[in-house]
């Protein structure tokens, strides 16, 4: 559908692009629930407008994406360990290789679907992604080969689409907290699926597991209906309808003079009060930013050296996140002594750190943007990048002092938690920088950055395959220092 522009009332929305300016509370409003002059309910509690629908759908989808993405890995690992189907060394090796296959598919998918979303819109891209993910996921269950394990990673493109959706719907002043909440909830899905799979595998008859294994794909498939029929690509409506409208009027310089466009109204009324109408003549030409695509502009994105700096930062940061999940018992020096249920609880606990760290990092980034504009966001990235590297260095030095697997376990766990929390603060600041780099190719930019994050997970796991934990962590910390220097030189 095409939304009437009378819905984008100041001060709740950016009058130039229809993007929402708040999520949890309207700015400069005394009321927590609604804005006094327009009576607009805060987006987090509303489903009326496309912004709120996109946010709530993105929350549901991103957690389902991560649950489904890590479902087969966690299912096979827990089942093999619980029933002692294989030796521990074989289980660990198989888990590591399966994880790397998944991240390879994730790297490709994130870049491709960022590009596709810029061309055909988020809704249709998401529907295609879900269909392919279900197809490859079920095929992987039935046939189980390396190619299908890689293709199973295609579902990771949903991270890009969900983040891109809220970036398209919400204004730059709150992108840190909105994308931070989204990323935090999504990564928490990893812990959730490990808990669910362990609980059910340890509770139900082994013969029934063959039916249980399909449930995430069925649930994911059901989301196609609300995505396609109950949501919009951008604040103005659906990509295809807007593209058609734009093409019909491409040669008209002032689109406000068109008299026969039924669903567009440039004048905003609030309770029959026209006090805001002069302040809210929306520049409809800005719709072009949401629906235009150019191959030449797309490839020009990669000439931006600042994009490389952010890509390396996300490679380092999200690479740490994925590496911790895969190697936590090794880092804690308890790989051979810890029980399966405690391993699952550790994964759950570390995934839960995302719920706190990412939104806080995003909120701090937004506040600095409010005070210092884009330079404020960049400085916060550098601060959290340096703190994460420092935490990693302290952890590295502490690990060197350990003499046995059970010595100083609590201190080691605390240091890893601090390292992970600082890293989550960093991740909460990164995505909010993307619209400042190229607002007309956000899918390509976000897809590129997110792909580097998956590459970080691949490299981190390869490093832990060939080096001991101390040396592996040292390599990661050195890369963190190099990344900090590159960011300081390029971004400031």
Predicted regions and their residues:
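Residue-level signature of mid-helix packing/kink "hotspots" within the transmembrane helices
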Residues: 73, 102-111, 157, 191, ...
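Extracytoplasmic
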Residues: 56-84, 88, 193-194, 322-329
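Conserved MFS/SLC helix-loop-helix module at the cytosolic interface between two early adjacent transmembrane helices
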Residues: 108-143
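Cytosolic juxtamembrane N-terminal segment immediately preceding the first transmembrane helix
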Residues: 2-78, 299
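Helix-loop-helix hairpin linking two adjacent transmembrane segments in secondary transporters
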Residues: 182-238
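Extracytoplasmic gate region of multi-pass secondary transporters
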Residues: 75-77, 304-362, 427, 431
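Cytoplasmic helix-loop-helix junction between adjacent transmembrane helices
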Residues: 149-185
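C-terminal transmembrane helical hairpin of 12-TM major facilitator-type secondary transporters
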Residues: 375-429
